[in-house]
Amino acid sequence: MPRPIQAVIHGPALANNLQIARRHAPNSRVWAVVKANAYGHGIERVYEGLRQTDGFGLLDLDEAVRLRQLGWQGPVLLLEGFFKPEDLAIVEQYRLTTTVHCEEQLRMLELARLKGPTSVQLKINTGMSRLGFAPAAYRAAWERARAISGVGTIVHMTHFSDADGPRGIEHQLAAFERATQGLPGEASLSNSAATLWHPKAHRDWVRPGVIMYGASPTGVAADIDGTGLMPAMSLKSELIAIQDLQPGATIGYGSRFTVEHPMRIGVVACGYADGYPRHAPGWDGNHTPVLVDGVRTHIVGRVSMDMITVDLAGVPEARVGTPVTLWGEGLPIDDVAQASGTVGYELMCALAPRVPVLVEPVGTAEAGDLGKAA
């Protein structure tokens, strides 16, 4: 028998989350962002759940080709564009939309002699200060892009740095408006946070990422309460051993947790080699949450490579084989991430290849029914 750990990708949740994004931006088209192998969920695994999107946004040419091989005929956006001149042959072959964010990319386009209309999203740096033309240089870049014979539609694009925080988007929105004033073309500005909370920035296209997977842009699960978003991934396992410990016993490497009263603990088949955060605390009053048989408890001691230990005080009926949820249905991934000093994005992307993954089909009536292996 294999280890009992598995991840479940919830197709119905993905489809639900796409509809939530549409309800928040009803007059916009949606780029469902599937970069980083769909935030660790797997492009092939999320495709059915997200295929009602208007387009997919991603980074790698390989990921774009995989989408085409799955049968996707709609728009595919390269969020960082192309990296070498030879990439443009693939852009044309697979009818990809490319971001253009710097002088070097613009020059490669001018020299490429593109055959057919290639759609471009021209990026403005309005304050994120990673990618994009400076606002003062944007109009000239747009004029050059428009003059390239193989360039088709040009969409104005930027990315918000503080849509999930108190500074907000006003300063960047104003810079965007100044840079694009009088220029024709559609606009794409909104990430997940702006899609949820800044309707004035929705424009023609929104680009939701982490909310597609049911997590919060702020990293705080409570901030998306009431939205209807659902977790797209559950990491599940079982208890593989139980220990009854007396005061003075210590738990795990480094003996970080010392038992102060008679205590029953469970050993879970999950560790940092599975993608669980090694730095998740389980001592000194700082405890990372976990569900045992649906009851919220917490880890005790250090996370090991293959195991974690959990407090069973609130689960007296627990035994070997009792189900455990590390995150997902009933336990927001953001709660685990926040306790561990990181964000849900990182935990999603860190799911280890050795963890078996099951896909719950989109048509499944009840969450938790397992579908095909993937």
From Swiss-Prot:
Family as reported in the entry's similarity comment: Belongs to the alanine racemase family.
Residues where N6-(pyridoxal phosphate)lysine is found: 35
Keyword vocabulary terms for this entry: Isomerase, Pyridoxal phosphate
Record field: catalytic activity: L-alanine = D-alanine
Keyword Isomerase: yes
GO BP: any one term: D-alanine biosynthetic process
Residues annotated to bind substrate: 130, 305
SMART domains: Ala_racemase_C (SM01005)
Taxonomic superkingdom: Bacteria
Name of this chain's protein: Alanine racemase
Listed EC numbers: 5.1.1.1
Pfam families reported in the protein's UniProt record: Ala_racemase_C, Ala_racemase_N
HAMAP family cross-referenced by the UniProt entry: Ala_racemase
Family matches, as NCBIfam families: alr (TIGR00492)
Pathway where it operates: Amino-acid biosynthesis; D-alanine biosynthesis; D-alanine from L-alanine: step 1/1
Cofactors, names only: pyridoxal 5'-phosphate
Gene3D superfamilies given in the database record: Alanine racemase, Lyase, Ornithine Decarboxylase, Chain A, domain 1
Cellular component GO terms, alphabetical: cytosol
